[in-house]
Amino acid sequence: MYHLGVPSTRALCVVMSTSDTALREWVGETLFEPCAMTCRVARSFLRVGHLELFGRRARDFGSAEARLELEQLLRHVLAREYPECLDPQDDSLRPALMRMLRPMGERMAQLMAQWWRVGFCQGNFQSDNCHLGGRTLDFGPFGFLERYNPRYCSWSGGAEHFSFRLQPKAALQNLASAIRAMDCLLDSEGREEGQQVLRDFPALLAEAFAEVRMEKLGLCFWDSDAARLCDELLQLMEASAADWTLLWRRLADVAQDWDELMEGGRLLEPLQGSFYLPLSPELEAAWSRWLLRWLTRLQGEGDCEEVAQQMRRVNPKYVPRNWMLMEAYEAAEAGNFQVAQRLQQIFASPYEEHPEDEARYFRLAPVEMRTRPGVFVMS
């Protein structure tokens, strides 16, 4: 996620035991697998759930000790995640908390837009998996979109409320929970500011999403026409069973060579291999119409080569799809770490071409992986 440009905690190392095993239950089989620990690093690992716990204690118990613990936690949040909200001349907690509310909402909105940009579905985005500093925290049942389905959820227990399209709604609920947990430490002005941030959150989301959508489409500014273009594209992608990563990346090829493609009647050619189902004549016609509208808009955006390069800087060519990761850990289990090492190199520069890896990794998900438990969806 870090190399994709998405705010995230980072992995330092993985340590595997050579003796201890744990019972893991998979679909249709029960296995003992080696135990391992992942060491992650970040400015903090503070979650909304932490704040909820101490906020509830302070609210329900009402003791000086419970209130002090909540204050200590929030001072730590400020010091580690929002030091710009501290006043060196004033150690008072209340005004610092009030100054922190809006940046917290802004970071949450930015994180949701960045997840959308790269097609990331967290799968279980409740308060225990929501970082107070606006970073990607928990990588449990996550999944990157293959076939675009806005209702996709990578966790079998997530239903639609943790789906790709509803992650911003979950973020709003988590933000509301965080603000509610601070309530007993805010005065009336601070409580009103918290409610105003919640009221403004849809606008913060709209601004963050407009920015990433504009960049993904290669546009210089966002307006109602650009919004319609993007909405129509998403509808086409869903109707056509388009691969999220492949389609966005290959649009840059259309932008770069549009004049040659149009002259040869080959406008759809760069998008071939991006769909999980054959395109009907009606969908082919719809794609052609959309591409013409989009290219007409792009002609006023600058040099074709520059537009294409800008699009490639925000539309990754490679993301850690679960079937790729499974291939790596199955090889590692057999003592071959070359696959994992190569993927690590690719994911360190996911916007680069890596032509030697295209056939293997810049492709639709293998047929046998498209519905496989533990790959397509996780428990």
For the regions a protein language model found, what residue spans apply to each?
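Conserved ATP-binding subdomain of kinase catalytic cores across diverse folds
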Residues: 2-89, 132-135, 162, 174, ...
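ATP-dependent phospho-/nucleotidyl transfer catalytic cores
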Residues: 21-122, 133-237
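Hydrophobic HxD+1 residue recognition
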Residues: 124-125, 130
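Regulatory N- and C-terminal appendages and interdomain linkers associated
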Residues: 156, 160-379
